[in-house]
């Protein structure tokens, strides 16, 4: 088993739910990214999603769009993000890291080159927002050949056919987008999520993480009751946007620890 599979197997054995925080690499300061990754892990993150900044992040709301713009303005590239993962791996060989972003930077690097360099850096999974499953078969095969999990999005609008397509090629976990629209938008309806998850789990043989719109421990706990993992991004990016630079890592760790405690409560309830 790879790191993602080991992590979810351990969570299932313990009756706990996964916590998957997202931050944008290089924001607000490229020199702080690895420190922030360690803060997430120390706070209780099970998997870290590291955003690769892109100039046209179509699935992201204004918070993460601003974050991408700041990172790009500071010279962050896919190559520098891979270097961050490699540095993180020097002192954390355990916490899975998933790169989340768009196809263009990967295609510019070359898929084969990306697969080799991501594997060498210690990347465990990759979620490419604009690779639909019906067009991603070759990409998924190349990722798996490099021991990298190809991770896919599902949404409230996903048809049974789309869910089945994802089930055929996904590994690691799938990311269920709990709201229509862009990241950070709207209010969650947990009962609606609960109604969708069984249909996904019946067709997809990997854990289901739920994200978009999760902003606090209470919401995270409610979502954890009906999913395998909770993904939180925009709220963390906002936290880093507003925190004093010297206290940002500590604030991140504290917030993640609060979410971890809430999810562990959900896990106990679910057993």
Swiss-Prot record:
<comment type="subunit">
    <text>Tetramer of two alpha and two beta chains.</text>
</comment>
<keyword id="KW-0028">Amino-acid biosynthesis</keyword>
<keyword id="KW-0456">Lyase</keyword>
<dbReference type="InterPro" id="IPR013785">
    <property type="entry name" value="Aldolase_TIM"/>
</dbReference>
<dbReference type="InterPro" id="IPR018204">
    <property type="entry name" value="Trp_synthase_alpha_AS"/>
</dbReference>
<dbReference type="InterPro" id="IPR002028">
    <property type="entry name" value="Trp_synthase_suA"/>
</dbReference>
<protein>
    <recommendedName>
        <fullName>Tryptophan synthase alpha chain</fullName>
        <ecNumber>4.2.1.20</ecNumber>
    </recommendedName>
</protein>
<dbReference type="GO" id="GO:0005829">
    <property type="term" value="C:cytosol"/>
</dbReference>
<feature type="active site" description="Proton acceptor">
    <location>
        <position position="60"/>
    </location>
</feature>
<feature type="active site" description="Proton acceptor">
    <location>
        <position position="49"/>
    </location>
</feature>
<dbReference type="Pfam" id="PF00290">
    <property type="entry name" value="Trp_syntA"/>
</dbReference>
<comment type="similarity">
    <text>Belongs to the TrpA family.</text>
</comment>
<comment type="pathway">
    <text>Amino-acid biosynthesis; L-tryptophan biosynthesis; L-tryptophan from chorismate: step 5/5.</text>
</comment>
<dbReference type="GO" id="GO:0004834">
    <property type="term" value="F:tryptophan synthase activity"/>
</dbReference>
<comment type="function">
    <text>The alpha subunit is responsible for the aldol cleavage of indoleglycerol phosphate to indole and glyceraldehyde 3-phosphate.</text>
</comment>
<dbReference type="InterPro" id="IPR011060">
    <property type="entry name" value="RibuloseP-bd_barrel"/>
</dbReference>
<keyword id="KW-0057">Aromatic amino acid biosynthesis</keyword>
<keyword id="KW-0822">Tryptophan biosynthesis</keyword>
